[in-house]
């Protein structure tokens, strides 16, 4: 069911980020912001993964249509655009150095340690880290919190 949350996040993103732009412009906006979070380290797009994700997406389409039927999406959500953004997001590539800088940016309260640029609001970082803690490890989601038994919760 984690894909449902990611698909909903894409639907919300499309509604909230530069609402008067097309899908390509929205993706470029997101890509550039991720690049800033990564301190301009390597951030790529794998078209083969994108095409594979789109060609084998029956379950994601079914989930999307289920969510649409139940009026879960914001008004005027285009399901195909939402799923395309989801597939594009699944097709991003980073290396370990890039991932380390992205993690360090979160650990540094939203300030990229390599550029010194404040790229995320502290409140957004707090929310992202909370989501990552509870449901950001895919099939291992939630289990980490119970095994670690953190007292910060």
Model-predicted segments: where are they?
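Active-site-adjacent helix/loop patches that line small-molecule binding or acyl-intermediate pockets
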Residues: 1-89, 100
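Active-site-proximal alpha-helical segments within enzyme catalytic domains
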Residues: 8, 93-112
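Short helix-capping/linker segments at secondary-structure and domain boundaries
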Residues: 16-19, 109-114
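Cytosolic covalent-transfer regions centered on His/Cys nucleophiles
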Residues: 82-86, 90, 94, 109, ...
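Conserved SxxK-family serine transpeptidase/carboxypeptidase catalytic domain
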Residues: 113-153
């Amino acid at each position: 069911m984690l894909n449902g949350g990611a698909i909903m996040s894409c639907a919300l993103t499309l509604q909230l980020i530069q609402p008067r732009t097309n899908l390509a412009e929205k993706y470029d906006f997101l890509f550039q912001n991720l690049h800033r979070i990564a301190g301009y380290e390597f951030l790529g797009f794998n078209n083969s993964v994108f095409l594979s994700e789109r060609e084998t997406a029956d379950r994601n389409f079914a989930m999307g249509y289920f969510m649409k039927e139940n009026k879960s999406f914001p008004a005027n959500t285009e399901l195909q655009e939402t799923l395309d953004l989801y597939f594009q997001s699944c097709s991003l590539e980073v290396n370990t150095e890039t991932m380390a800088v992205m993690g360090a940016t979160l650990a540094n309260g939203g300030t990229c340690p390599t550029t010194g640029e404040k790229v995320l609001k502290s409140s957004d970082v707090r929310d992202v880290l909370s989501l990552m803690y509870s449901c950001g490890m895919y099939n291992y989601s939630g289990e980490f919190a119970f095994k670690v038994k953190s007292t910060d919760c």
